[in-house]
């Protein structure tokens, strides 16, 4: 259903209270459950910060994506053209990763990337489970001067579902 502000003010009993204390007492008496994502919404509204969806959208707007089929074809031809960087946690990486991928968890990226990948001109392809964390990782790499970083579209989940090979351990 839908409504407009005028109708709500006229008809909604919760909006009939003009005294702040009465309104608070009435709302507390209803004992309503807190809305989902209330903490994030409050933090965002109070600080002016971005939401997770906003961070992902900003990152996706400035990161190129590599299609799963393009990477699979390049790997089959023996030349990925990228340094593959799997940013998932160790247990996920060990359970199955794209052959040849280096492992650097997203939580350690900023601290360890320069030691692991000293060439800022390298073409780096970040990989995660669903394609979201790898997007953030690629954006971070670009912020750190790795200007050719990209993200695998769809992640390992899509790779697995397509029946493409994964290496263990």
Language model segments and positions:
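Active-site neighborhoods of enzymes that stabilize oxyanions during catalysis
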Residues: 163-169
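A short, well-structured juxtamembrane/interface segment
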Residues: 60-77
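Catalytic cysteine-centered active loop of the rhodanese-like fold, especially the PTP/DSP P-loop
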Residues: 104-161
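Accessory terminal helices/loops
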Residues: 1-65
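Short loop/helix-cap segments at secondary-structure boundaries that form the rim of catalytic
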Residues: 93-99, 159
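Short hydrophobic beta-strand that contains or immediately precedes a catalytic carboxylate
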Residues: 71, 83-88, 104
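Short glycine-rich anion-binding loops that position phosphate/pyrophosphate groups of nucleotides
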Residues: 89-91, 130
